[in-house]
Curated annotation (Swiss-Prot):
Family matches, as SUPFAM superfamilies: ARM repeat
Entry keyword Cell membrane: no
Single GO MF annotation: translation initiation factor activity
Family: Belongs to the eukaryotic initiation factor 4G family.
Alphabetical list of Gene3D superfamilies matching this protein: 1.25.40.180
Protein name in the entry: Eukaryotic translation initiation factor 4 gamma 2
GO biological process: regulation of translation
Keyword entries, A-Z: Initiation factor, Phosphoprotein, Protein biosynthesis, Repressor, Translation regulation
Domain W2: 1-70
Amino acid sequence: QVHCYNSNFPKGMLLRFFVHFYDMEIIEEEAFLAWKEDITQEFPGKGKALFQVNQWLTWLETAEEEESEEEAD
């Protein structure tokens, strides 16, 4: 987030980072979703960052819910 902020949020950069970290299993779903909910002024650019990745985070949240439902069956 801070790197993208300092780079003036190049279009799609943060989304590419998130997808890559997710696909490479570097960061787990719970960490992405916790970041989404963590509203703090400590790091600038959170609003723009969320705007870039919100659709992907929504997909991730939906996929995680479906996976949880399948495991419960």
